[in-house]
Amino acid sequence: MAKIISYDEEARQGMLEGLDKLANTVKVTLGPKGRNVVLDKTYGAPTITNDGVSIAKEIDLEDPYERIGAELVKEVAKKTDDVAGDGTTTATVLAQSLVHEGLKNVVAGSNPIALRRGIEKATEVIVKELVAAAKDVETKDQIAATATISAADPEVGEKIAEALDKVGQDGVVTVEDNNRFGLDLDFTEGMRFDKGYIAPYFVTNADDQTAVLEDPYILLTSGKVSSQQDIVHVAELVMKTGKPLLIIAEDVDGEALPTLILNNIRGTFKSCAVKAPGFGDRRKAMLQDMAILTGAQVVSDELGLKLESVDTSVLGHAKKVIVSKDETTIVQGAGSKEDIDARVAQIRAEIENTDSDYDREKLQERLAKLAGGVAVIKVGAATEVEAKERKHRIEDAVRNAKAAIEEGLLPGGGVALVQAAAKAEKTEAVTSLTGEEATGAAIVFRAIEAPIKQIAENAGVSGDVVINTVRSLPDGEGFNAATDTYEDLLAAGVTDPVKVTRSALQNAASIAGLFLTTEAVVANKPEPKSAAPAAGADMGY
């Protein structure tokens, strides 16, 4: 494909127009009185949302230079969303403000590299001030407050606080459609996976068609269990103990399956066979998770273990196992806490290192099953469009609440940024800057006011008046846009997680630095649209 190249001011101006188009669309959603944006879809109903990253992803501009500028800001929103789960609109507003302030100086002749260094140094000092000002989350009410701010719905805040209180920080809170109007909250006890019994003959409870095994042994194998010889040895070992047996394998078929079923029906030996979840490497990883949770060893050729020669030391144990047609739940596995903690740490490290959203989601599910639990918030609404919008808000609020638990809380409404910047300006790390690095730092201190101004303007109040008033207030006090009052924001429950505020500033500063130091842009040349073919003479009917 042919390329077009532009340089210097022309390059930056085209990118700036794209940045502004995206940022101006996103920033109308900021704050408690922010508006929604309607996103048209090729198929199905449109989506109505106030989620910055969802809006940014939908914007695809025609002009190649504008598209590049918009893509840079999309990266700010996406990176902030990946790290913190919220703060995407704040990050976008900060990036726009930093770029505009910076370009004024570049046009006036400042060295972009020196400006970038100043921006980075000022950002680093402000982040330290934000972290130092953090307040730990100590109560369920604080979690509810921060989730309420994110979702703009007190009922959602309460449900999320209840869910996280039950499943813990590492637990998974999923959001699903509800057939009924309103919000419902369900919890899963223990490790649950989406595979049920291989045959209905294993059912022990006819009323709800489940197989319930009390205090069972658990056999985990990565291969198929097919021959009678495969199963008889293990069955005889377990029968001597008088306990039931759960078999989780790639498959149970051949002579092995009818052998288990017949013994089950006759009451000789109680058991249940289940297919292992997942495929390939993910199946192996999930089997290993189960092994650690239950204190078992996975029987596999790779480890040199054969079913016909194993003893009870390779079998796992649990207080109870409940198996339905579609899923299996292992309650209170007998694995050691040290082994489980080590596995949890390993999965956390994998989450940090993966670039794939899909892999990250699957790893987080595995983490929850090992370390916490699973809560499901079911959302029902009058229309499909309203339900989709509400689900978006709840998903954001869940991640916001988890970020608050992880790194603590700050006063919300953009106030924490302004007050941290005021302290940072007086530190030696900033006052010792000279020349154009000092100019770069000054760019950050001016741009940092953008979120609070935008929140005020979306609430119908002058941003400049709010900024001047907030500067004169004690730490922690600021403008509550929901009530149009100045008050102690932490006490009023107007809070932001440190992780969200910090990530928004760091990602905005990073992209702004790249933007200012851009001197040439190489873009794909737009292909001319082909004219529609003319109708033939015989097409007139």
UniProtKB/Swiss-Prot annotation:
<feature type="binding site">
    <location>
        <position position="496"/>
    </location>
    <ligand>
        <name>ATP</name>
    </ligand>
</feature>
<comment type="similarity">
    <text>Belongs to the chaperonin (HSP60) family.</text>
</comment>
<keyword id="KW-0143">Chaperone</keyword>
<dbReference type="InterPro" id="IPR018370">
    <property type="entry name" value="Chaperonin_Cpn60_CS"/>
</dbReference>
<dbReference type="InterPro" id="IPR027409">
    <property type="entry name" value="GroEL-like_apical_dom_sf"/>
</dbReference>
<comment type="subunit">
    <text>Forms a cylinder of 14 subunits composed of two heptameric rings stacked back-to-back. Interacts with the co-chaperonin GroES.</text>
</comment>
<dbReference type="Pfam" id="PF00118">
    <property type="entry name" value="Cpn60_TCP1"/>
</dbReference>
<keyword id="KW-0547">Nucleotide-binding</keyword>
<keyword id="KW-0963">Cytoplasm</keyword>
<dbReference type="GO" id="GO:0005524">
    <property type="term" value="F:ATP binding"/>
</dbReference>
<dbReference type="InterPro" id="IPR002423">
    <property type="entry name" value="Cpn60/GroEL/TCP-1"/>
</dbReference>
<dbReference type="GO" id="GO:0042026">
    <property type="term" value="P:protein refolding"/>
</dbReference>
<protein>
    <recommendedName>
        <fullName>Chaperonin GroEL</fullName>
        <ecNumber>5.6.1.7</ecNumber>
    </recommendedName>
</protein>
<comment type="function">
    <text>Together with its co-chaperonin GroES, plays an essential role in assisting protein folding. The GroEL-GroES system forms a nano-cage that allows encapsulation of the non-native substrate proteins and provides a physical environment optimized to promote and accelerate protein folding.</text>
</comment>
<feature type="binding site">
    <location>
        <begin position="480"/>
        <end position="482"/>
    </location>
    <ligand>
        <name>ATP</name>
    </ligand>
</feature>
<feature type="binding site">
    <location>
        <position position="413"/>
    </location>
    <ligand>
        <name>ATP</name>
    </ligand>
</feature>
<dbReference type="GO" id="GO:0016853">
    <property type="term" value="F:isomerase activity"/>
</dbReference>
<keyword id="KW-0067">ATP-binding</keyword>
<feature type="binding site">
    <location>
        <begin position="29"/>
        <end position="32"/>
    </location>
    <ligand>
        <name>ATP</name>
    </ligand>
</feature>
<feature type="binding site">
    <location>
        <begin position="86"/>
        <end position="90"/>
    </location>
    <ligand>
        <name>ATP</name>
    </ligand>
</feature>
<dbReference type="InterPro" id="IPR027413">
    <property type="entry name" value="GROEL-like_equatorial_sf"/>
</dbReference>
<dbReference type="GO" id="GO:0051082">
    <property type="term" value="F:unfolded protein binding"/>
</dbReference>
<dbReference type="GO" id="GO:0005737">
    <property type="term" value="C:cytoplasm"/>
</dbReference>
<dbReference type="InterPro" id="IPR027410">
    <property type="entry name" value="TCP-1-like_intermed_sf"/>
</dbReference>
<keyword id="KW-0413">Isomerase</keyword>
<dbReference type="GO" id="GO:0140662">
    <property type="term" value="F:ATP-dependent protein folding chaperone"/>
</dbReference>
<dbReference type="InterPro" id="IPR001844">
    <property type="entry name" value="Cpn60/GroEL"/>
</dbReference>
